[in-house]
Amino acid sequence: MQAGIHPEYNEVVFQDISTGETFLTRSTIEKTSGDTITLDGKEYPLVRIEVSSASHPFFTGKQSLVDTEGRVEKFRQKYGMRK
C-alpha cells in the first residue's frame, strides 16, 4: 500500500434523527461538523442521518411515511391530490 493515498478509517457514531437510535461503527466519512457524542466514556464524531434500519419501514415492519423535506406535500400540491 502506498502511504498517504488512503482515507482514514475511524470509529463514528451515526444517529437516526427520527428515532434517536445510535450506531457505533467504523467509516471513512469526513468530519463535516463539529458534533461529537460520548459513548462508554469515549468521544466519537457524530453523523446525523434521516433514515436507518431503526426507522425504515422495511426493517421495522411498519408502514409509515418519512418525509422530512416536504417532498410528499409538494407532490400533492402539484398534482392536486388530497390526503
Curated annotation (Swiss-Prot):
The record's listing under InterPro entries reads: Ribosomal_bL28/bL31-like_sf (IPR034704), Ribosomal_bL31 (IPR002150), Ribosomal_bL31_B (IPR027493), Ribosomal_bL31_sf (IPR042105)
Q: Which GO terms describe its cellular component?
A: ribonucleoprotein complex; ribosome
Supply one GO molecular-function term.
structural constituent of ribosome
Domain of life (superkingdom) = Bacteria
> What's one GO BP annotation on this UniProt entry?
translation
Q: Which Pfam families match?
A: Ribosomal_L31
UniProt keyword list = Ribonucleoprotein, Ribosomal protein
Quaternary structure note? Part of the 50S ribosomal subunit.
Instruction: Write out the function statement from the record.
Output: Binds the 23S rRNA.
Q: Which family does it belong to?
A: Belongs to the bacterial ribosomal protein bL31 family. Type B subfamily.
What PANTHER family is this protein classified in? Answer: 50S RIBOSOMAL PROTEIN L31, CHLOROPLASTIC, LARGE RIBOSOMAL SUBUNIT PROTEIN BL31C
HAMAP family documented for this protein: Ribosomal_bL31_2 (MF_00502)
Known NCBIfam families for this protein? Answer: L31 (TIGR00105), PRK01678.1 (NF002462)
Specify the protein name. Large ribosomal subunit protein bL31B
Q: Which organism is it from?
A: Hydrogenovibrio crunogenus (strain DSM 25203 / XCL-2)
Gene responsible for this protein: rpmE2
